[in-house]
């Protein structure tokens, strides 16, 4: 399984420097939508990393697909702080227990 990263240049640069090969630099919302659809169809991707704000800018249907996706597992970073709640909920959903309590 591979790690994929989607986002603007300033978000993906560090991942690219760390050696991640599946990096999709997307300057606008249509490019982000296209990259997300591509990654969702790619069975070799196990984890998708995106900026929380970019996920928030996606159409509702695509955002729902990301939230319900098991493979790839979507990790949202940065943004307004709601990303940690999202990660908490994903862990709770996967494990069945709230590990933060």
UniProtKB/Swiss-Prot annotation:
Keyword Ion transport: yes
Any one Gene Ontology cellular component term annotated for this protein: plasma membrane
Pfam families: ATP-synt_F
GO MF term set: ATP binding; proton-transporting ATP synthase activity, rotational mechanism; proton-transporting ATPase activity, rotational mechanism
Miscellaneous field: This organism has both a Na(+)-translocating F1F0 ATP synthase and this H(+)-translocating A1A0 ATP synthase.
Similarity comment text for this entry: Belongs to the V-ATPase F subunit family.
Protein's name in the database: A-type ATP synthase subunit F
Species name: Methanosarcina mazei (strain ATCC BAA-159 / DSM 3647 / Goe1 / Go1 / JCM 11833 / OCM 88) (Methanosarcina frisia)
